[in-house]
Amino acid sequence: MSIDINWEAATSGPDGEALAERIRSFIHDKFQQIALPRFIRSVEVNSFDFGTIKPELQIKDLCDPFEDFYEEDEDNEIGDGEVSDIQDRSPKPRPSSAGNERSAADAWQAEHPAFLDDRLCGRIEPHDVPIPSKEDPLASRPIRSPMSFGDPLNPYFFPRAGTPGIPGGTSNLGYYYMPLGGISGTQTPLSSVPRGPFSPGLRDASVFGEPSNSQRPNPSGPARRQSEIDIDTGNSRPSTADTLDSLNIHGIPDPVLPRSSDDAHPNVLPRRDNSPAPRRVREKRPEDLQVLCRLRYNGNIRLSLTALVLLDYPMPNFVGLPLKLNITGLTFDGVAVVAYIRKRVHFCFLSPEDADTLFGADDTNEAGHLQSRDSLAGGINDTSYSSRRPHDSLLRDVRVESEIGRKEDGKQVLKNVGKVEKFVLEQVRRIFEEEFVYPSFWTFLV
């Protein structure tokens, strides 16, 4: 189905002039953001005109709008009647009953290294130090010296590797924590040295043997113990994950380190609350409509630009010559997408690859082989830049006129600057494809 467009009514009058000025200002701003080559100082867009030739539209399909058209931009204002249409498609955060504790802990972490695990960073609630009773077997446990390495049944007692100049070596396997010691420097806290044999709540295997029947049996206990012995015989620092696993072998919770739900996965760092903002998606309605139509244009649209070209003779940046470029027409053939969702109209073009996927390859290359118009006289060059392959760009053919310097006896001082023309036309194509080709699209309020 073809559509007849009243091109003159749409592009003339105050509304048409305002639209043309907005397009000129938009292209000019885009050129100010482009890194110019060394031989061009600046590029200015002077004017834009729609021309008198109208495009041809042919409707190809009516379907549901693309999913991207339902996403709500954070910068867009939402009316009172549209608030209920916004849906949140992100996972809901888990409720927390300790908001003040979390904020205090996050403030503490901001002043400390972030690579440490939360369980070993000192996030410990105030508590009373338990005093062992006479009936507690832990109270009668013998105190071992850091130099006592003779117990063959305890996998923690291994001699430290010798280092020249440092008595006893540098391995941290010989440092043990005494709960009531409190001497700084000679003992290392449990939070920084894992697998200390005198950690609170950790039973010594050489004294008490296997766990009692009241504790939950762990079938993987003996295999785990053997693997720990094989791993700990090296001189490397023991793994932090093995520390927490060894506490669970005997089924005894640690009274110093608070347990959390993240302890079930000791190798996974705790999740931070820095997830990206949720996507706001509008609710779909039956009246939403999208039109896919083929747009062909071979018209006399005009765009006037001025580029200041630098001359390096007889010295660098000796003089700048204004190069005036006039785009006098172009040939376009592509698939346009117009989606109507309530009070918004979304507009874009499909890339040639996407268009071929939807409708098949184009068997007629009429737009790519149209002849350019006759050249204008008076010392103005007319150059036609066509794509070598039909699908390189939606802009199949761009006709440009170049004029540089002043005229003497009807002739230009410099008749053609091919590099400047090529650069400007490549940027015009790039701006069009980046701003108008899907997934980029424009939204209009109606």
Curated annotation (Swiss-Prot):
The SMP-LTD domain, residue ranges: 1-446
Major localization class: mitochondrion
Domain of life: Eukaryota
Keywords from the named record: Endoplasmic reticulum, Lipid transport, Lipid-binding, Membrane, Mitochondrion, Mitochondrion outer membrane, Transport
Biased composition (Basic and acidic residues): 126-138, 260-274
InterPro entries membership: Mdm12, MMM1_dom, SMP_LBD
Record membrane topology: Peripheral membrane protein
Gene Ontology CC: one annotated term: ERMES complex
UniProt entry tagged with the keyword tRNA processing: no
Pfam families hit by this protein: MMM1
Biased composition (Acidic residues): 75-85
Keyword match Protease: no
Location(s), subcellular: Mitochondrion outer membrane; Endoplasmic reticulum membrane
Compositional bias per record (Polar residues), positions renumbered to this chain: 233-246
GO function terms (MF aspect): lipid binding
Gene Ontology process terms (BP): mitochondrial genome maintenance; mitochondrion-endoplasmic reticulum membrane tethering; phospholipid transport; protein insertion into mitochondrial outer membrane
Domain text: The SMP-LTD domain is a barrel-like domain that can bind various types of glycerophospholipids in its interior and mediate their transfer between two adjacent bilayers.
Subunit structure: Component of the ER-mitochondria encounter structure (ERMES) or MDM complex, composed of MMM1, MDM10, MDM12 and MDM34. A MMM1 homodimer associates with one molecule of MDM12 on each side in a pairwise head-to-tail manner, and the SMP-LTD domains of MMM1 and MDM12 generate a continuous hydrophobic tunnel for phospholipid trafficking.
Role noted for this protein: Component of the ERMES/MDM complex, which serves as a molecular tether to connect the endoplasmic reticulum (ER) and mitochondria. Components of this complex are involved in the control of mitochondrial shape and protein biogenesis, and function in nonvesicular lipid trafficking between the ER and mitochondria. MDM12 is required for the interaction of the ER-resident membrane protein MMM1 and the outer mitochondrial membrane-resident beta-barrel protein MDM10.
Name of the protein described by the UniProt record: Mitochondrial distribution and morphology protein 12
Organism: Coccidioides immitis (strain RS) (Valley fever fungus)
Taxon lineage: Eukaryota, Fungi, Dikarya, Ascomycota, Pezizomycotina
Gene name in the database record: MDM12
